[in-house]
Regions:
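Amide-forming acyltransferase catalytic core, primarily the GNAT-like/NAT-type
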Residues: 16, 118-210, 220-221
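Glycine/small-residue-rich loop that forms an oxyanion/phosphate-binding "nest" at active or ligand-binding sites
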Residues: 85-104, 108-110, 123-130
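A short helix-loop-beta-strand connector motif used in the catalytic cores of GNAT acetyltransferases and
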Residues: 30, 36-56, 68, 100, ...
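Active-site/acyl-donor-binding loops of N-acyltransferases
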Residues: 105, 116-134, 203, 213, ...
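Flexible loop/N-cap segments at domain edges
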Residues: 197-203, 209-242
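Conserved beta-strand in the GNAT
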Residues: 47, 52-61, 66-73, 192-204, ...
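Conserved acetyl-CoA-binding loop-helix of GNAT-fold acetyltransferases
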Residues: 74, 80-93, 115, 218-231, ...
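Helix-loop element at the rim of GNAT/NAT acetyltransferase active sites that forms part
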Residues: 12-15, 20-32, 157-168, 233
Length: 294
């Protein structure tokens, strides 16, 4: 460990350097996403700095029912010196001590998290639709653009489905990319779970746009929402991080010209409070908002 390395709070003044770090590692964040992360976790965002500048970042977010670790990144030239461990400890320290802590790990980061007591909960796969993919699938079902008055319903549902109080990120995503914000509604005679059997949101990115979360009551509903979101894409790369357990939806993504890119591992470090369980229905999360947000 370099003696002149410091772990301190990440501030708005650091966003330019943090963006350069994430971009140099091939990450997708834009400056406004970094700013938004600082808004939701102003006392949980940390940076590792040397006299030469920022060499690492990590953010610990208090989502109410659990903590979330995001933006764990160390400059490749500085890896192997214990910096990731120090950043992880700082981010975990920003979360109330009784809460379980979750994160989405890459294969590279998983061994570090296992050393700190994180256990595998589930697996996901990042699916990428190339910029030169053909026309989007035909949209089916009762799907319409999500409007501002719908947000309160979506946030209430998302609280239950995700277990996280992440209204800030959801509202930000809606404002950032309304072209990916869709809601599936039942006809007047349909259903027993209100008039919202599904919704999706998305956001723009430096390299690709990201669609998620996708929440629906069936594979058909999830596919209808995803098809609508694909139709809103202007021809760039599009990413969906889908739960591996939803095999029919994963097959639909493949038919829609998405290609599997890499695995992600949803992990949890138990706390004194119980780990929120994933609801069994009627609404199901088919794709996550992203490793940054849970």
């Amino acid at each position: 460990m370099a003696a002149d390395l410091d772990i301190r709070l990440l501030t708005e003044d650091d966003v330019g350097a943090a963006l350069a770090l994430s971009a140099s590692s091939g990450w997708n964040q834009r400056a406004d996403e970094w700013h938004m992360m600082l808004q939701i976790a102003p006392s949980g965002a940390f940076t590792a700095t040397t006299p030469d500048g920022i060499v690492g970042t990590a953010i610990g977010i208090d989502y109410g029912n659990f903590g979330w670790i995001a933006m764990m990144l160390v400059n490749p030239a500085w890896r192997g010196r214990g910096i990731g461990a120090r950043l992880l400890e700082a981010a975990m320290g920003a979360v109330p001590t009784d809460l379980p802590i979750r994160l989405d790990a890459t294969p590279l980061g998983r061994p570090l998290y296992e050393r700190y007591g994180f256990e595998l909960e589930s697996s996901l796969t990042r699916h990428v639709r190339p910029a030169d993919a053909g026309p989007p699938p035909a949209r089916s079902g009762h799907v319409r653009p999500l409007a501002e008055p719908d947000l309160s319903t979506v946030m209430r549902l998302d609280d239950r489905i995700s277990g996280a109080h992440r209204h800030g990120p959801l509202r930000w995503a809606f404002g950032d990319a309304p072209r990916y914000a869709w809601i599936r509604v039942l006809p007047p005679e349909g259903g027993s779970h209100g008039d919202t059997p599904g919704y999706c949101l998305g956001r723009g990115g430096r390299l690709f746009d990201h669609v998620g979360p996708i929440v629906a009551d069936s594979t058909e509903s999830a596919a209808a929402l995803a098809a609508a979101a694909i139709g809103g894409n202007g021809g760039g790369y599009l990413v969906v991080d889908a739960h591996d357990t939803h095999e029919a939806f994963v097959a639909w993504l493949r038919d829609a010209q998405f290609e599997p890119q890499r695995p992600l591992y949803r992990m949890c470090r138990p706390g004194q409070s119980p780990v929120p369980s994933r609801p069994s229905g009627p609404l199901i999360e088919f794709a996550i908002m992203g490793p940054e947000f849970s």
